């Protein structure tokens, strides 16, 4: 709770701090508050379009929702910006294949 408050306060004083939005998204992820997590990830990417971690987290949310077309689009964007998280692309692609196969068999 203290961390969340500090990041929220930082946003009040520095509304363009993408890292605060990212860390809030992580906190909301732990709290399983997907709506707030998504909102903060989108703000992070608005302020810092090349933020790999936010993009990866957003892809995970869309995979969970079975929003495969969005996952494909986000993965293309992720491919173009990745530096540190490039190894995660194969993981995303495998999860997408598995989810699509599972949905097709239902």
Model-derived segments and spans:
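Canonical positions in the second alpha-helix
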Residues: 10, 43-44, 77-78
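Structural marker of alpha-solenoid helical repeat scaffolds
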Residues: 13, 47, 80-84
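Terminal, low-structured helical/coil segments at or just beyond the last alpha-helical repeat
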Residues: 72-106
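Canonical tetratricopeptide repeat
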Residues: 23, 57, 91-95
């Amino acid at each position: 709770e203290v961390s969340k408050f500090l990041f929220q306060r930082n946003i009040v004083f520095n509304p363009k701090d993408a890292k605060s939005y990212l860390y809030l998204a992580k906190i909301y992820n732990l709290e399983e508050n997907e709506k707030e997590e998504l909102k903060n990830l989108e703000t992070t990417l608005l302020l810092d379009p090349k933020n790999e971690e936010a993009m990866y987290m957003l892809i995970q949310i869309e995979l969970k929702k079975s929003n495969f077309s969005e996952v494909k689009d986000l993965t293309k964007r992720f491919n173009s910006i990745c530096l540190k998280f490039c190894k995660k692309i194969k993981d995303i692609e495998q999860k997408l294949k598995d989810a699509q196969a599972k949905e097709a068999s239902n």
